[in-house]
């Protein structure tokens, strides 16, 4: 059975006009390596830690500014939200299609809330806590191309033509602000698009981005702004001692107009100055150590890296299944070809390397979790190939071969062919990222030993489910297994309304 909404009644949760206050008993374990009777052994000690959560229930008017607004992802997301808001339908070769938010975790997935008369009861994910309605988002942003969003949508060739015709009147007046352009960080083939750029030194560029954010917020009368990078993949920045390794060195490098500070880092820096959430949707190392230090010091939310939408999402499920089943993946070969501007930019070796790193590290935590299958330091052979084929456009093809060792020296091979409609998969993920980032800023918590409430750590691990290479605070384990990431996100939101984690034990029927 599916229900639209619910309210929790419990001694551990209290609803007021302004907030939801919950008390949550976090059950975990403590491991001790100790000497007992002359030999060392591991001891696992269950423990319970009490947390309190406060969630502000006042949903703000939200503005979303996209870096690369005129790209395929930006035009697809903007058009998709307009289509939903206006209730647009259009003819395809198969049927009359209604606008929807399929592919969005927050808008189109469900959670189990219990059982009733022997039947499982589910509710929308978005019913857990008050969230921004995507139809109410105000969009803006920057692009190095001055093409309006209607023409950008036509250039992208993602939407059906009938839908494009209906969206055009809404999108013709949407023109991106000039963006930061540094040809050293992206492929040379992007130069022909760069007719809308911010001039000046890096310090002046940061100041202009800050000015743009403030003017957007004032003009549109929004309460909050989230900024997200969905522009070209950049090459990796060199981490240099004395340049970007500390907060002080990074800020000094911007003052000196050092060439190795990337555009994405400059956007993030501007957002941190304004205490506005910044999310990196591409694989480059935007968050150099000095930038992370600054975000932590100023308690400004940052998240990333790289949207997890197609091939990598499948990989984080399949390898988790294989290793969890006691099967040993020994070779993973991933081949992609695509024909959109992302593919053209990735045809340059230096930008492809950023994507290769992002895609290759996704199985690390799953491999290291099983010392029966893998010796220390052992890892599957893992190869990632991306080729640019203009004809296929946004319809990316992903082909994977997984070779594994099975019982008694046998070999098992799984081959997948995945046609990933690149921007149609990425757009709802962008939506989830900005909605969850905004929600995160309204949640505070404290442990039983803490005197006052505080926000989540500014390095937003809560967004990990949506990213290929999750950004985590220093010293925090990286989790890539998709099921664990979703469980973490759902269970944190459940804790905010006093609900226990979903453990699937269903003891009442045993």
From Swiss-Prot:
<dbReference type="GO" id="GO:0006021">
    <property type="term" value="P:inositol biosynthetic process"/>
</dbReference>
<feature type="binding site">
    <location>
        <position position="190"/>
    </location>
    <ligand>
        <name>NAD(+)</name>
    </ligand>
</feature>
<keyword id="KW-0444">Lipid biosynthesis</keyword>
<feature type="binding site">
    <location>
        <position position="70"/>
    </location>
    <ligand>
        <name>NAD(+)</name>
    </ligand>
</feature>
<keyword id="KW-0963">Cytoplasm</keyword>
<feature type="binding site">
    <location>
        <position position="71"/>
    </location>
    <ligand>
        <name>NAD(+)</name>
    </ligand>
</feature>
<keyword id="KW-0520">NAD</keyword>
<feature type="binding site">
    <location>
        <position position="394"/>
    </location>
    <ligand>
        <name>NAD(+)</name>
    </ligand>
</feature>
<feature type="binding site">
    <location>
        <position position="423"/>
    </location>
    <ligand>
        <name>NAD(+)</name>
    </ligand>
</feature>
<dbReference type="GO" id="GO:0004512">
    <property type="term" value="F:inositol-3-phosphate synthase activity"/>
</dbReference>
<feature type="binding site">
    <location>
        <position position="282"/>
    </location>
    <ligand>
        <name>NAD(+)</name>
    </ligand>
</feature>
<protein>
    <recommendedName>
        <fullName>Inositol-3-phosphate synthase 1</fullName>
        <ecNumber>5.5.1.4</ecNumber>
    </recommendedName>
</protein>
<feature type="binding site">
    <location>
        <position position="309"/>
    </location>
    <ligand>
        <name>NAD(+)</name>
    </ligand>
</feature>
<feature type="binding site">
    <location>
        <position position="143"/>
    </location>
    <ligand>
        <name>NAD(+)</name>
    </ligand>
</feature>
<keyword id="KW-0443">Lipid metabolism</keyword>
<feature type="binding site">
    <location>
        <position position="180"/>
    </location>
    <ligand>
        <name>NAD(+)</name>
    </ligand>
</feature>
<keyword id="KW-0594">Phospholipid biosynthesis</keyword>
<feature type="binding site">
    <location>
        <position position="422"/>
    </location>
    <ligand>
        <name>NAD(+)</name>
    </ligand>
</feature>
<feature type="binding site">
    <location>
        <position position="340"/>
    </location>
    <ligand>
        <name>NAD(+)</name>
    </ligand>
</feature>
<keyword id="KW-0398">Inositol biosynthesis</keyword>
<dbReference type="InterPro" id="IPR036291">
    <property type="entry name" value="NAD(P)-bd_dom_sf"/>
</dbReference>
<comment type="pathway">
    <text>Polyol metabolism; myo-inositol biosynthesis; myo-inositol from D-glucose 6-phosphate: step 1/2.</text>
</comment>
<feature type="binding site">
    <location>
        <position position="232"/>
    </location>
    <ligand>
        <name>NAD(+)</name>
    </ligand>
</feature>
<dbReference type="Pfam" id="PF07994">
    <property type="entry name" value="NAD_binding_5"/>
</dbReference>
<feature type="binding site">
    <location>
        <position position="355"/>
    </location>
    <ligand>
        <name>NAD(+)</name>
    </ligand>
</feature>
<dbReference type="GO" id="GO:0005634">
    <property type="term" value="C:nucleus"/>
</dbReference>
<feature type="binding site">
    <location>
        <position position="281"/>
    </location>
    <ligand>
        <name>NAD(+)</name>
    </ligand>
</feature>
<keyword id="KW-1208">Phospholipid metabolism</keyword>
<feature type="binding site">
    <location>
        <position position="342"/>
    </location>
    <ligand>
        <name>NAD(+)</name>
    </ligand>
</feature>
<feature type="binding site">
    <location>
        <position position="393"/>
    </location>
    <ligand>
        <name>NAD(+)</name>
    </ligand>
</feature>
<dbReference type="GO" id="GO:0005829">
    <property type="term" value="C:cytosol"/>
</dbReference>
<feature type="binding site">
    <location>
        <position position="231"/>
    </location>
    <ligand>
        <name>NAD(+)</name>
    </ligand>
</feature>
<keyword id="KW-0539">Nucleus</keyword>
<dbReference type="InterPro" id="IPR002587">
    <property type="entry name" value="Myo-inos-1-P_Synthase"/>
</dbReference>
<feature type="binding site">
    <location>
        <position position="341"/>
    </location>
    <ligand>
        <name>NAD(+)</name>
    </ligand>
</feature>
<feature type="binding site">
    <location>
        <position position="233"/>
    </location>
    <ligand>
        <name>NAD(+)</name>
    </ligand>
</feature>
<feature type="binding site">
    <location>
        <position position="73"/>
    </location>
    <ligand>
        <name>NAD(+)</name>
    </ligand>
</feature>
<feature type="binding site">
    <location>
        <position position="72"/>
    </location>
    <ligand>
        <name>NAD(+)</name>
    </ligand>
</feature>
<feature type="binding site">
    <location>
        <position position="306"/>
    </location>
    <ligand>
        <name>NAD(+)</name>
    </ligand>
</feature>
<dbReference type="Pfam" id="PF01658">
    <property type="entry name" value="Inos-1-P_synth"/>
</dbReference>
<comment type="function">
    <text>Key enzyme in myo-inositol biosynthesis pathway that catalyzes the conversion of glucose 6-phosphate to 1-myo-inositol 1-phosphate in a NAD-dependent manner. May play a role in oxidative stress resistance and influences ascorbate levels.</text>
</comment>
<keyword id="KW-0413">Isomerase</keyword>
């Amino acid at each position: 059975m599916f229900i639209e909404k619910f309210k929790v009644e419990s001694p551990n949760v209290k609803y007021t006009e302004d907030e939801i206050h919950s008390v949550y008993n976090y059950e975990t374990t403590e491991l001790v390596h100790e000497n007992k009777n002359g030999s060392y052994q591991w001891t696992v000690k269950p423990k319970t830690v009490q947390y309190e959560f406060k969630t502000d229930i006042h949903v703000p008017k939200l503005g979303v500014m996209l870096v690369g607004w005129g790209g395929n992802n930006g035009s697809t997301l903007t058009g998709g939200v307009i289509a939903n808001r206006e209730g647009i339908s259009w003819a395809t070769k198969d049927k009359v299609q209604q606008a929807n938010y399929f592919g969005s975790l927050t808008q189109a997935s469900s959670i189990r809330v219990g059982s009733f008369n022997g039947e499982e009861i589910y509710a929308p994910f978005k019913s857990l806590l008050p969230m921004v309605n995507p139809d109410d988002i105000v969009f803006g942003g920057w692009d190095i191309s001055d093409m309006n969003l209607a023409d950008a949508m036509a250039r992208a060739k993602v939407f059906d033509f009938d839908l494009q015709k209906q969206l055009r009147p809404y999108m013709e007046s949407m023109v991106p602000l000039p963006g930061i352009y540094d040809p050293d960080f992206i492929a040379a083939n992007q130069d022909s698009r760069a007719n809308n750029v911010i001039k000046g030194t890096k310090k002046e560029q940061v100041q202009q981005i800050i000015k743009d954010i403030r003017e957007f917020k004032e003009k549109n009368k929004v309460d909050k702004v989230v900024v997200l990078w969905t522009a070209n993949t950049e090459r990796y920045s060199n981490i240099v001692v004395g340049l970007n390794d500390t907060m002080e060195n990074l800020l000094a490098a911007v003052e000196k107009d050092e060439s190795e500070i990337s555009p994405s880092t400059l956007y993030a820096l501007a957002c941190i100055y304004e205490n506005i959430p910044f999310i990196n949707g591409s694989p480059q190392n935007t968050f150099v150590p000095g930038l992370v230090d600054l975000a932590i010091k100023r308690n400004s939310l940052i998240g990333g890296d790289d949207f997890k939408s197609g091939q990598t999402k499948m990989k984080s499920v399949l390898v988790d299944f294989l290793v969890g089943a006691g099967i040993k993946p020994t070779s993973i070969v991933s081949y992609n070809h695509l024909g959109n501007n992302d593919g053209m930019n990735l045809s340059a070796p230096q930008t492809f390397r950023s994507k290769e790193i992002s895609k290759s590290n996704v199985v690390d935590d799953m491999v290291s979790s099983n010392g029966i299958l893998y010796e220390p330091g052992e890892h599957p052979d893992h190869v990632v190939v991306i080729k640019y084929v203009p004809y296929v456009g946004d319809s990316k093809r992903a082909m994977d071969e997984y070779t594994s060792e099975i019982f008694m020296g046998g070999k098992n091979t799984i081959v997948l062919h995945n046609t990933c409609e690149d921007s149609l998969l990425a757009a709802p993920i962008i939506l989830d990222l900005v909605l969850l980032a905004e929600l995160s800023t309204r949640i505070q918590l404290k442990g039983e030993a803490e005197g006052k409430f505080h926000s989540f750590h500014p390095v937003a691990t809560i967004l990990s489910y949506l990213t290929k290479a999750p950004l985590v605070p220093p010293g925090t384990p990286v989790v890539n297994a998709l099921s664990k990431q979703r469980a973490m996100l759902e269970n944190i939101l459940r804790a905010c309304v006093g609900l226990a984690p979903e453990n699937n034990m269903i003891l009442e029927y045993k």
